[in-house]
A protein has these predicted regions:
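Acidic Gly/Asp/Thr-rich repetitive segments characteristic of extracellular carbohydrate-active
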Residues: 93-131
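Short acidic, low-complexity intrinsically disordered linear motifs used
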Residues: 676-679
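All-beta strand scaffolds that present successive hydrophobic residues in beta-strands
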Residues: 143-145, 174-176, 202, 232-235, ...
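Consensus "Asn ladder" position of solenoid repeat domains
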Residues: 179, 237, 261, 291, ...
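Short glycine/acidic-rich loop motifs that flank beta-strands on beta-rich extracellular proteins
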Residues: 131-135, 157-163, 184-192, 210-212, ...
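PEST-like, low-complexity acidic/proline-rich intrinsically disordered segments
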Residues: 1-18
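Acidic, Ser/Thr-interspersed intrinsically disordered low-complexity regions
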Residues: 4-8, 39-91
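Extracellular beta-strand-rich solenoid/capping regions of secreted or surface-exposed proteins
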Residues: 111, 115-119, 131-145, 154-232, ...
Length: 679
């Protein structure tokens, strides 16, 4: 018994280790098909890269029509399924004029057609490769597309954007569809001349416990180990001096729709030492749909970067970017929607959205106005990113619904100083935590409903920070995580209700020192170390109410070094020990049912004190209540029967013997045993 009582929360027996290893092996087998599919997909992408390189090889031979025709035919093989969905694009608008671009048409360059275009005109570009830096300034209601839906025109550029758009009004519209954009990078001398200064972009990153303060500039860029980035901090004027001068598509004012396009940064040929976005959006509205946005394995790229912009991204694939798939800096007037997209194989993060001024300031600015920040992340696959899958910082009104966060290198998703809803998502096999809810500077009041957290390498849900009052509610599966189902620490005070928490390798719920939680109406079972554990300074506000707590190979509830705590109306059964209290003070247990636990229903040890009122302690396979090591209990109106030993008091606790018999209903062969040779 001494050995048992001195066990800490960090002990686990050899059988649990074996079980953990078996589950890890099974998990690897189950993901084999997914990884195989990903490898096949990467092979297809390698072929796409080769196709992009062919464009460079024949750039100086662009007038050789035979080679050009063959090249464009090869390009059309890329992502065949996307083309099938969009080959019959039908834009029913009536246009006043149609401007055609090509060697056989009136306009030989795209820029010439743009310059001549009027509102309600459409520009159709014949198949071919156009090396231009197209500028659309002061135009509205213009459509730009390929002449042949089955043969995309290619706009090729380096040093400057393939296309830069600056309308007169935000309501002015430009539509772009069925075009391929290729950017080949930025020369260092061009970049320096742009006054793209260090101060406008900084990152603090950690790599293998070694910290760097990283500048996005030539001298320091070699230190950038983005593939293992743990944190990204963006200052207010990120990319301000750039103003979209270095990207594939730059949107600086207006409402721009990009549909059924392909944007590739895979064929960078210059020694680019800047971070290159595929799409840059500032103070504008961008709608990006059915578009493939490819990064580069060797150079620093971002899929989409937006600053103070409205962003709607739908059914896009954004992949292989070394600085993140989507990065967005928002204010109180912005709306960010990402739906039905695939964000895969990006380094640093799949998706990052943050407010610079903070959540409270955003809410204050939004008061009395119709404008309010909206973030909708719905039905996306955020998978295999070499970093965090999704990271939201200082945001409110976030709706994270129906996404899959799978096999990301760090955490599946992180919400820092946020509120909103996280509903019906899957967090599975991420190498860190499934979901991190953190309060650093402001409160976190996120509501976590009906999600699945399975086989994450750390915790299913990690909750931390002062004023973290998040709600964990109705999640049907928090299971198979290699540490804890739910981990509460660093002053957090969440509410955890109506969840199924089971088969986690450490604890179902762990509440550490200086934190507390309301744990109510959950089913918590078959967790390997304990079903619920809490203890340490300030954990005494923890309340465990109306739960079913069963089938743990160790303790149903384990409490150590806690002062206070309320455990009421729970069913605690089929555990090795129902409840263990070590060095605790003033624990209040009432109206609980303890039955069919293997060793003890309730153990008080190491000078613990507790009040037990109206509990039913029946049919446990050894001892009903064990009080030892100078512990003191106040027992009243408890029903104690049909245990092998109803009540056991160690030598230094015998003064409670008559008190227990008088105030409680103790029935059975052994009412009180003064000594026990087993412990």
């Amino acid at each position: 018994m001494e050995e048992k009582d001195n066990d800490s929360l960090n002990l686990i027996d050899s059988s649990s280790k074996k079980s953990q290893q078996d589950s890890i092996n099974n998990s690897q087998i189950k993901t084999k098909k997914k990884q195989k599919d990903l490898i096949l997909e990467e092979n297809d992408e390698e072929k796409d890269d080769e196709e992009d390189e062919k464009i460079n090889d024949i750039e100086n031979e662009i007038n050789e029509n035979e080679k050009l025709k063959d090249l464009m035919a090869d390009m059309n093989e890329e992502e065949e399924e996307e083309e099938d969905e969009n080959e019959n694009l039908n834009y029913d608008r009536h246009f006043d004029r149609e401007l055609k671009v090509g060697k056989d048409y009136e306009y030989k360059t795209i820029q010439a057609a743009i310059n001549d275009a009027k509102p309600n005109n459409i520009i159709k570009i014949s198949p071919g490769i156009y090396r231009e830096n197209v500028v659309i300034k002061g135009k509205t209601k213009i459509d730009i597309c390929s002449l042949d839906n089955n043969d995309q025109a290619v706009l090729l550029s380096d040093n400057s954007p393939c296309m830069m758009i600056y309308c007169l009004e935000q309501s002015d519209t430009i539509q772009i569809y069925n075009i391929k954009f290729i950017h080949r990078g930025i020369r260092e001398d061009i970049m320096k001349k742009s006054l793209f200064e260090i101060k406008f972009f900084s990152r603090y990153m950690t790599h293998n416990k070694e910290s760097y303060f990283i500048y996005q500039f030539a001298e320091e860029i070699e230190k950038l180990e983005i593939n293992y980035v743990l944190d990204i901090k963006i200052v207010e004027n990120i990319f301000e001096e750039n103003h979209g001068n270095f990207c594939a598509i730059s949107i600086l004012k207006g409402t721009v729709s990009i549909n059924n396009c392909k944007i590739s940064l895979a064929c960078i040929t210059t020694e680019t030492k800047s971070i290159l976005p595929a799409i840059y959006v500032e103070n504008s509205t961008a709608i990006v749909e059915n578009t493939l946005i490819k990064g580069n394995k060797d150079y620093l790229t971002i899929g989409i970067y937006s600053h103070d912009a409205q962003l709607k991204i739908n059914e896009c694939k954004i992949f292989r970017h070394k600085c993140g798939g989507i990065i967005s800096v928002v204010n109180e007037k912005n709306s960010i929607t990402v739906q039905k997209c695939r964000l895969v194989l990006n380094q640093g993060c799949g998706l990052l959205i943050m407010s610079i001024v903070g959540k409270s300031a955003l809410k204050e600015k939004a008061k009395g106005t119709k404008d309010t920040l909206e973030i909708n992340i719905e039905k996306n696959n955020i998978e295999f990113n070499e970093g965090c899958g999704m990271n939201l910082k200082k945001c409110f009104n976030a709706k994270i619904i129906g996404n899959i966060f799978l096999s990301n290198l760090l955490n599946g998703a992180e919400l820092t100083d946020c509120d909103g809803f996280v509903m019906m998502n899957v967090f599975e096999k991420n190498k860190g935590n499934g979901l991190v809810l953190e309060a650093i500077e402001e409160s976190n009041e996120a509501k976590i409903f009906k999600n699945k957290f399975d086989e994450n390498y750390k915790n299913g849900i990690d909750i931390s920070g002062d004023n973290n009052k998040c709600f964990i509610n109705q999640n049907d599966q928090i299971s198979g995580n290699y540490l804890n189902g739910i981990y509460v620490h660093n002053l957090a005070t969440p509410e955890i209700k109506f969840n199924n928490i089971y088969e986690n390798y450490h604890h179902g719920i762990l509440v550490e020192s200086k934190s507390s939680a309301l744990i109510e109406k959950n089913k918590i079972y078959e967790n390997i170390r304990t079903n619920i554990a809490f203890g340490g300074l300030l954990t005494g506000k923890t309340r465990i109410l109306e739960n079913e707590i069963y089938n743990s190979r160790n303790e149903g509830i384990y409490i150590v070094d806690a002062e206070g705590g309320e455990i009421g109306n729970n069913k605690i059964y089929n555990n090795n020990d129902g409840m263990v209290l070590i060095r605790c003070k003033d624990i209040f247990l009432y109206c609980n049912e303890f039955y069919k636990n293997m060793r003890t229903a309730i153990l008080l040890s190491d000078s613990s004190t507790a009040t037990l009122l109206k509990n039913e302690i029946c049919e446990n396979y050894f001892i009903g209540i064990l009080v030892r090591d100078g512990s003191q209990g106040r027992f009243k109106d408890n029903l104690i029967r049909q245990n092998v030993i109803q009540f056991y008091l160690s030598k230094n606790c015998l003064n409670q013997k008559n008190y227990v018999k008088k105030l409680n209903d103790v029935q059975g062969r052994y009412e009180v045993a003064d000594y026990c040779c087993v412990f």
